[in-house]
């Protein structure tokens, strides 16, 4: 299963030129600054804009092929589209809004039913309300449920959290994670938030000025030093681990790194043993030492190997890429510290991780 998107679309001051081969499963994030082409790409896939030259194929369905002069209109494309703000019918109840999406699909073709959509998004208690009596986060969950009830082969989400405050975002993120875990519907997710991408996406496409700078698994791509992602204050890595222990006395969760016996400890509520989850480590929260120090308040000290380095976003710092038993790690340190430690590729030393963010 795969998604092929080849687009060339020119405006007076902007050109979109993409050739992407994307996974046909999971969540793919289109990530980049404002004006990079994220939403234009999504609109072309939806058929809301027509690329002058291009081909769009979702698994075995071709929606556009300019060489064959084929263009499937938007209403005939099996997709769901979630905008920044949910466009709900104000005069209809939540249930009637959802039924509007459901009625578009013949019963024999429905892959998501009303009960499943309302349970996944936690909206069963809202069915008799009207949109004007809902919070922003609730309206967005209704919009997502309505898109799912069209039983799409592809779900497009255009910055669905952008219009929400931080509290509403934190409320809706767990529901988006459930969609990822429980539905076999590929998602293209537009965002300029690296935290959202790190938490939700499996694959990332980094866009800039209408072109793809990189495309690959989230963990690998965020750790690349040759991309602009590495230069900002948000530079860091996303690692997948499994819960191996919980200490109820100190309320510490122990996470085992993939393919090794190394562990990370983090203050967190208890989670089921064996549960897979992601965590993020910012480069600014990693320091380096030539030897381990047990007499330290820093819980997480790991043996690492230096891979390479690049200048950081200011002249005083460098960004060092490290290997931790096969998993990447970044450290942002001063050039003075680099020289004091005589850092070089292949060198073995200790990383001291001052903070870990569990993405769940």
Swiss-Prot record:
The keyword Cell membrane applies. SUPFAM superfamilies: MOP-like, P-loop containing nucleoside triphosphate hydrolases. Keywords: ATP-binding, Cell inner membrane, Cell membrane, Membrane, Molybdenum, Nucleotide-binding, Translocase, Transport. One of its GO terms (cellular component) is plasma membrane. It is a peripheral membrane protein. ATP binds at residues 32-39. One of its GO terms (molecular function) is ATP hydrolysis activity. Residues 5-234 form the ABC transporter domain. It comes from the Bacteria. Residues 295-360 form the Mop domain. Its main location: membrane. Its EC number is 7.3.2.5. InterPro entries: AAA+_ATPase (IPR003593), ABC_transporter-like_ATP-bd (IPR003439), ABC_transporter-like_CS (IPR017871), Mo/tungstate-bd_C_term_dom (IPR008995), ModC_ABC_ATP-bd (IPR011868), Molybdenum_import_ModC (IPR050334), Mop_domain (IPR004606), P-loop_NTPase (IPR027417). It catalyses: molybdate(out) + ATP + H2O = molybdate(in) + ADP + phosphate + H(+). The keyword Translocase applies. It is found in: Cell inner membrane. The complex is composed of two ATP-binding proteins (ModC), two transmembrane proteins (ModB) and a solute-binding protein (ModA). Belongs to the ABC transporter superfamily. Molybdate importer (TC 3.A.1.8) family. Part of the ABC transporter complex ModABC involved in molybdenum import. Responsible for energy coupling to the transport system. This is Molybdenum import ATP-binding protein ModC.
